[in-house]
Regions:
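A structural signal for short, well-ordered beta-strand segments and their strand-loop junctions
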Residues: 30-31, 88, 318-319
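Leucine-rich repeat
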Residues: 181-191, 215-222, 246-258
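Short, recurring structural edge motifs at helix starts
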Residues: 5-7, 33-35, 77, 113-124, ...
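A short local loop/turn or secondary-structure capping micro-motif enriched for an aromatic residue
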Residues: 37-38, 98, 154-155, 327, ...
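Right-handed parallel beta-helix
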Residues: 1, 5, 10-28, 39-59, ...
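Short, well-ordered beta-to-alpha junction loops that form the rim of enzyme active sites
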Residues: 31-34, 82, 149-150
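Acidic, glycine- and Ser/Thr-rich low-complexity intrinsically disordered tracts
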Residues: 68, 72-73, 227-235, 239-350
């Protein structure tokens, strides 16, 4: 890690992590992941450039590894396993890949009651709550943002942590999410494995996302014996759907097993708002009738009206004045991220 915390018996916080160039193999910023009796709070992560050099990724030339030529273990840019009241704003996150214990997602919000080799669950009070991620750009990664409440250990002998709730993600760009970065190329994973107190109250609003065209916009799941998730708000986003837009993550007893967007969303969440999104290039197998109502479905990228799409890799995603999605948000703003505001937020991040 470049910065780590959340594994102690003392009350930590407030934290300000600002104006840094952060480079690390595992995670550039990590809170949690071990034994703790208290949770770090009031954390601001502002105006940082998160970075992993491509020389660390096997297959690249030149390749730089550790002793004996083994590759470094790469996980993600930001992972929260034990943190409350967190603001992540105006960060640039470049280059992340899977191939080890993770699959290339740039950001993980995953409260964890860490399981030790001796069989102990050492952080039942760990939680990730009240997190806002805004005006942030994640690029060149195996996946976008993962929001998961999972059991520790192998999922059989482990135990849940305390809470995963109240996540707000807005005015974020996720581009060049690609399977070539040893991941699924999915924009969002939303999954619960806790029997009680499930993952809940997630807002994804005004996000522009380009998952791998052969992959997914969202992977979701929750076993039928668990308490259902609730409180999903997915609105005003502008995102490619991928070939398999809303896909199952938890096997044959999962709420998302049928892989049909409206069915999966309805079965996985007892309460949700999923509307006023621009869902780009939906495949023929998933026409508008298989989605929640009140969404928009541009059939091609050209129908959106980006200033410069650039194949979803470093483009200018501000909407042209002629775009049919200009000022079409429920708040009167453009669908997708506030690109002008994002560029201003990142102007001095190098």
């Amino acid at each position: 890690h470049a910065v780590a915390g959340g594994v102690s018996d003392t009350q930590d916080g407030p934290f300000l992590i600002q104006d840094n160039f952060l480079e690390a193999t595992g995670e550039e910023v990590m809170f949690g992941g071990g034994a703790a009796t208290l949770t770090p709070s009031d954390i601001e992560i502002l105006n940082n450039h998160f970075w992993k050099p491509w020389q660390w990724m096997p297959g690249n030339t030149p390749f730089v590894g550790g002793p004996n030529g083994n590759p470094f273990i790469v996980k993600n840019h930001l992972e929260l396993k034990n943190a409350v009241r967190v603001l992540v704003e105006a960060n640039l996150m470049d280059n992340n890949w899977g191939g080890f214990s993770q699959t290339g997602y740039g950001i993980l919000l995953t409260p964890k009651n860490q399981h030790t080799q001796s069989g102990a669950d050492v952080c039942p009070l760990c939680q990730v709550t009240d997190v806002t991620i805004r005006y942030t750009y994640v690029s060149h990664a195996g996946g976008g943002i993962q929001m998961v409440t999972d059991l520790s250990g192998n999922g059989k002998d482990g135990a849940p942590a305390l809470a995963g709730t109240r996540f707000s993600i807005h005015d974020v760009v996720l581009d060049d999410l690609n399977k070539k970065y040893v991941g699924g190329g999915t924009a969002f994973m939303i999954m619960n494995a806790w029997p009680k107190n499930p993952l809940n109250t997630i807002t994804v609003n005004h996000v522009t996302a380009f998952p791998d065209p052969s992959s997914h916009m969202i992977i979701m799941g929750n076993l039928s014996q668990n308490a259902p998730m609730y409180g999903l708000v997915f609105t005003n986003n502008l995102t490619v759907t991928g070939q398999y837009p809303v896909w199952n993550a938890e096997g044959s007893t999962s709420c998302a097993f049928e892989d049909v967007p409206i069915t999966s969303i309805t079965k996985c969440f007892t309460s949700y708002t999923f509307g006023n999104n621009g869902l780009i290039t939906p495949p023929p197998a998933f026409p508008p009738s298989k989605w929640p109502s009140n969404n928009m479905f541009p059939q091609t990228i050209n129908d959106v009206g980006f200033t410069n799409y650039n194949n979803g890799n470093g483009g200018n995603y501000e909407l042209l004045s002629s775009s049919p999605y200009k000022n079409k948000g429920t708040d009167g703003k453009d669908l997708g991220a506030d690109i002008v505001g994002l560029n201003q937020a990142l102007a001095n991040v190098e």
